[in-house]
Amino acid sequence: MALRSSRAQAIGELAQQAHAGGVDRRSFLLRAVALGVSLSTGDAIFRTYSARAFQDESGSPITVTVGGTPIAAMEPDLTNATPGGTLRFGRSTDSDNLDPVTNDGNVNIWYFMSIYDQLVRVAPDGITLEPALAESWEISDDGKTYTFHLREGVTFSDGTPFTADDVIYSWTRAANDPDEHWTFTLTALQRDENGQVKGITAPDANTVVVELAQPWSPFLSDVAMFNMSIISKAFAEGNEETLVESAMGTGPFSLQEWKRGETLTLVKNPNYWEEGLPLLDSVVVSVVPDDNARILQIQGGELDAMMDVPSSRVPELQMDPNLKVYQFPSTLTAYIVLNNRNAPLNDVHARKALQYATDRQTLIDVVLFGVGVPATSFMPQGALFWNDKLTPYAFDIDKAKAEMAQSATPNGFPLELKIRGGSPDEETLATALKDMWSQIGVDVTITPTEGTTLQDDYDNQNFQAMTSYWTNDIIDPDELVAYAILPESSQAFQTGWVNEEAQKLAKDGTAEPDSAKRDEMYRRIQEIYNEESPMLSLFYKPYLDITTTKVHNFGHPPTGQFDWRTTWIEQ
C-alpha cells in the first residue's frame, strides 16, 4: 500500500473540514482547485462529504470523537474469546444466487463460502493452500492423477455424513451443468463422447481419485475455487434448481433465512468439523445500500461491522474510540469495464485514448484519499506471475488526443458510465473521470444504479462502461486470466474482447508444468492486455472494513471471502 501523498493528505483534511462544517462550498472549491482538483470533481467531493451529507434524521451532524486507534489485521487471538452472540454485518448489495456452480459475483461468493467447504482451501495469508475436507493428497508423476484422502467423521449441517459420493456428485454437477459460470476449473477433466465428465471415482468412502485428460498445473488451486464446493448429494440431487436460495454444506455456518433485499441469516453449524468453531451463534447480513447510512447504523448500535467504508471517512472513523478500522491486504483491482462488442469501444484507439486521459494518481488522491496504488495490470499487485515490469498508462492528454484522432470517432463520443448508487467513492470517481475524459471529446453520462440491477446489467452486457472490481478467489492466475480472456471458460467474461495470441497463451499456460515458463506466458498475456486495453485497470486498494470495539478477530482475507470462524463478540 502506498503512503498517502501530501496532496491526498491535504484533500483528505479539506474533506474532513467540510464534514465538520468548518468550510463553506466556495472556500472548499477554491482550495480544491488550488490542489489540482477540477471544479466539478471538487463540487462532487463537497456535496458527498459536507456536514449536511452526514446528518441523521434529526438533522444533527455526527460528532467526531478524538481518541480512537486504527487496528491492523492480525492473527486470531482466542485467549479471552467468549463464544456466542450474533454479528450484525452491513453490506451495500444483496446476494442473488447462493449456488456455488451457477452464481457469478462476490455478492454471493463472499457469504456462501461460510456455508460450504472445498477439499482444499486458500490459507488466511491468501498465497498458500491448506487441507480442508481432504486431509492429504498425492499427485502422479505425469501430473494427470490426483488422489484425495478425505477427512473422516465430517457431517453436513443437517447431520448427514460427508463421503466421497458427495464429492463426485458436486464436481460432476459443476462440470456438466449448462449454467456453470466457471468452467475453467474443469477444463482438464475427462469427458465421454457426449461431453459428460468422467474419471472421478471413489475407491472407498474416504478416497477420491481424479484422472485428468491432460496435465493441469493449477488444478490443486482450482480445487479451492468456490464452484468446487462440496454440496450434500442427499439434499440437492433432483432439486438443483433450489440451490439458488437454499444450501447444505459442511462449513462453519448454515443458512437459516434469506429475506431478499433485506437480510441473510447464517447460524452456527453444530456439526462443524473444526473443533470449537465457529465462536459466533449467528451472523445477520443486512443490505444497506448507502455507505454513509451504514456508518450511521454502526455508530448508532444497529450494526456491529460493515464493509465498503468510503475512503474519505477513514481518518475520521479512526479517531472514534468505539470503532476499529481495518485496512486488510487485498487482491482487489478496481477497473472500468468496457463493452468491446459495439462501437465506439470496439476500436482499440478509442480505448487507448481513455487510458491516456485517465489520471490514476489523481483518482487515488481524490477518491481513495491516498490509500491505493495505480494499477499496472488486470492482475493484482504481487500475485503469482504478476508482471512487475509494466507501468501504468501515463496521464497524457496529447497522446490521448492522438489516439482518438486515429479512431473511428476522432471528435469523441457520448458514453454512459454506470456506477453503484449510494456510493460516495464511486460518485466522486465517476465525476473525476467525466472531467478527465471531456478533454478528449468524451461526453460522459453518469448513471447511478442499484447494486443488484448493476450486477444484472453486467451479466447481460447491458452497458457501455461500468465501474467494477475483481479479486482472486484462488492463488493461481488461471482464474482471472480465464475471466478476462477466455469467453468459453467463464460466463463472467464480459468485455467481448478477442485476441488469439492471448487466448492461446492462456490455454497453454495451464498445461505448462514449468513455473518459469508459465511466468513468461502470463507476463506476455498482461502485456497484450495492457496494449489492447479491453478495460481500464485503475488502482489496487485494501479492503476497508469497520467494526465496533466489541468485535474481535474479524477476518477479511486477501481473496475476499469473509472468514468468521474465529470472530467473537463481547456480550
Specify the residue positions occupied by each region the protein language model found.
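Aromatic- and charge-enriched surface segment that lines or borders ligand/interaction sites
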Residues: E135-W182, V209, Q297, P344-N346
